[in-house]
Design a protein with these regions (language model features):
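Mono-ADP-ribosyltransferase
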Residues: 1-202
Length: 202
């Protein structure tokens, strides 16, 4: 297993995509090997660090009011789907350490999300409508974020959701990945989990 090597510059998209898919494959491979106890301690530690670096790249390259490149979004989607499945493997195995990892990372509870315009080029008077789908996006455990609000123009859309049975989010704080006070959890925008949609004018 090789250490992940994400690019320093945000515009090195192809290299980033290659690394995301590589870690996704590692997640799937390690998940299968854990079932037969064929993962060395060194490989497992390197694997966890690669997951951490991938999540760190996600937070460091998620920009307020800007959509991700579609190819990058697709790569991250496959990574998060694989990580979600991996966490359930950890939870179901008779191993206290793996169970603890899954228990900390799989999140249920309230989350909040802002949608808005990152510049004044487009019409900022209209709030952005939520897109309900299975795409993993950034949410926060904190209901209010003045920093995010300061970066958006015009009308902002504020969402609240409650994750309950049968869903879980992936808590990035549990992996030690944090940006400011955002307390980030990744979770799709699933309509039945949404408890409130509010439009806030600047």
């Amino acid at each position: 297993m090789k250490k992940v090597d994400f690019p320093f510059w945000a515009d090195e998209t192809e290299k980033a995509i290659t690394e995301i898919y590589r870690v996704k494959s590692q997640v799937q491979s390690v998940g299968n090997k854990l079932k037969t106890n064929h993962v060395s301690n060194n490989d497992f530690q390197l694997f966890l660090d690669n997951v951490y670096q991938t999540l760190n790249y996600w937070t460091g390259n998620t920009y307020i009011g800007r959509k991700k490149d579609k190819s990058v979004q697709k790569a991250f989607q496959t990574f998060f789907e694989a990580l979600y499945d991996f966490l359930f493997i950890c939870r179901d195995l008779d191993n206290p350490m793996l169970w603890t990892i899954a228990d900390k990372v799989l999140y249920r509870g309230s989350l909040y999300r802002y949608l808005g315009h990152g510049s004044t080029i487009c019409n900022t008077n209209n709030g952005i409508e939520p897109q309900y789908n299975n795409i993993y996006v950034s949410w926060s455990k904190a209901p209010k974020n003045y920093y995010i609000e300061s970066k958006l123009y015009g009308t902002m859309t504020w969402l609240a959701c409650k994750i309950d049975e049968p869903y879980y989010g992936i808590d990035l704080e549990a992996f030690g990945v944090a940006r400011g006070k955002e307390a980030e959890v990744v979770f799709p925008t699933i309509k039945e989990t949404i408890t409130e949609v509010r439009y806030i004018k600047e």
